[in-house]
Amino acid sequence: MKEQLIATCIVFLLTLGFAGRGTCQEIPSTDYDAVKETIEQSIGWAIEKDFDAMFRLWDENMFHFWLFSDSLVVGLDSFKVYAEQWKDPDFHGTRFEFKDLRIVFSSSGDVAWYSCFLDDCGSYKGREYCLENVFQTGVLEKKNGRWIHVLMHGSYPVDKIPENYVRRFYSNLFEKKEQL
């Protein structure tokens, strides 16, 4: 009986060892800090308005979809056109914060994906505004020794859409129901 128990334990431990191979790495890799910095600079670039530095953070075949339907951008060339709006001298990034940032690496170690809640603040014509608690996700790939974004998505959970957006984009829906 003792031999069977030992054999069962050995088989179980070997099974765990093989089952763990090829899975994702939730333990920080040696690239964790580089990935985190790339994620942070994808928003933080706006404080210095360094467009060249920002564009280096993105892959040629990148995909970007932010809060509004007109923010769907595919490809770096299209992203450069989309970014023209941020060249307005009255626009400035002021501060940002990533909360609950979670980064996971692929088993090969050359792909990372993340999620967080983002506060992204800027000013326009001297008036500050903030996007708070945006649920942000993204995928980065390591190419030629550098981590770059291939996908970024930002949204609000449907139960946490800020009231000013509900009023701005959905007020007609509520007015129609009230008239019925």
Locate the predicted segments by residue:
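A short gly/proline-enriched turn/hairpin at secondary-structure junctions
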Residues: F63-D77, K87-H92
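Hydrophobic pocket/interface hotspot
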Residues: S42, M54-F55, M62, G75, ...
